A protein has these predicted regions:
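Long, K/E/R/D-enriched contiguous segments that form extended
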Residues: 41, 55-61, 71
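Metal-dependent DNA phosphodiester-chemistry modules and their immediately adjacent helices/loops
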Residues: 63, 67-158
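Phosphate-handling catalytic cores of nucleic-acid transaction enzymes
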Residues: 156-168
Length: 168
């Protein structure tokens, strides 16, 4: 397959517990929602807000809403995939990667996705994460950028929640 020739090792990554393989040729994002519920149920980790890419998100949103997380309550926050929205987050990710502050535990999927990602700068000097080669995947890199954007937007709220848990 194209992914295999691009360096993807899906079967190995699944065997090692890094990914879950779903049926068909597209990603079943309801499985991602199930993962969040599993984290909450098993480890009692409360999800404060969840950022998501609007592309193909319908199944994810529907399942998350079944579990009680909604867009109306601002539990689910759409992060537009454009340079105006992601510029600050991309610059922060880049700086933290260069400073070796990002610990991805040598996750081979993250390493592969980060290696496939480049930065495109528009005429307004805004950054966007792009594939260095069309056939390669950058989903893990984009997820990290969305995480940084969510942290940037909701840092104060997150820090208050962490402080509250630590004081209990």
């Amino acid at each position: 397959s194209d992914d295999k020739s691009a360096g993807a090792k899906y079967e190995e990554w699944a065997k090692d517990g890094f990914i879950t393989i779903t049926e068909g040729n597209d990603i079943d994002l309801s499985v991602v929602a199930d993962f969040f519920l599993d984290i909450y149920t098993k480890y009692k980790i409360k999800l404060i807000r969840i950022g998501y890419d609007q592309r193909y998100a319908r199944a994810f949103i529907d399942r998350m809403e079944e579990y009680g997380w909604t867009r109306e309550a601002e539990d689910l926050v759409m992060i537009l995939q454009n340079a105006a929205t992601l510029d600050n987050a991309i610059r922060l990710v880049e700086a933290d990667l260069k400073a070796r502050l990002v610990n991805y535990n040598q996750n081979p999927v993250d390493k592969w996705c980060l290696g496939n990602a480049g930065i495109e700068i528009d005429n307004k000097r805004k950054c966007l994460c792009v594939k260095v080669e069309e056939r390669k995947r950058i989903d893990g890199a984009v997820t990290l950028i969305i995480l940084y954007e969510m942290y940037r937007r909701y840092r104060t709220e997150l820090e208050k929640a962490v402080k509250k848990v630590r004081n209990v």
